[in-house]
Amino acid sequence: MSDTVERVKKIIVEHLGVNADKVVEDASFIDDLGADSLDTVELVMAFEEEFGVEIPDEAAETIFTVGDAVKFIDKASA
């Protein structure tokens, strides 16, 4: 598992209080992990802080799953 995946999972577990086993690549923040719209905004801000990347609102609106977040961060960090 990549460093990005591990760090993203840690942030999600800390912010949403979910079991790490539920945080899989295709897990939807809202449908599978119980996040609401405020949670998703807070996750995006936490990702930005942790990885030193900027996630524009247009991009944030396309990040629905754990895998979406990892892909965006990896691309933005490259």
Curated annotation (Swiss-Prot):
GO BP terms in the entry: lipid A biosynthetic process
Keyword Lipid biosynthesis: yes
Keyword line: Cytoplasm, Fatty acid biosynthesis, Fatty acid metabolism, Lipid biosynthesis, Lipid metabolism, Phosphopantetheine, Phosphoprotein
Organism expressing this protein natively: Bartonella henselae (strain ATCC 49882 / DSM 28221 / CCUG 30454 / Houston 1)
Name of the coding gene: acpP
Name of the molecule in the record: Acyl carrier protein
Compartments reported by the entry: Cytoplasm
Pathways involved: Lipid metabolism; fatty acid biosynthesis
InterPro entries for the chain: ACP (IPR003231), ACP-like_sf (IPR036736), PKS_PP-bd (IPR020806), PP-bd_ACP (IPR009081), Ppantetheine_attach_site (IPR006162)
Lineage: Bacteria, Pseudomonadati, Pseudomonadota, Alphaproteobacteria, Hyphomicrobiales
Protein family: Belongs to the acyl carrier protein (ACP) family.
One GO CC term, this protein: membrane
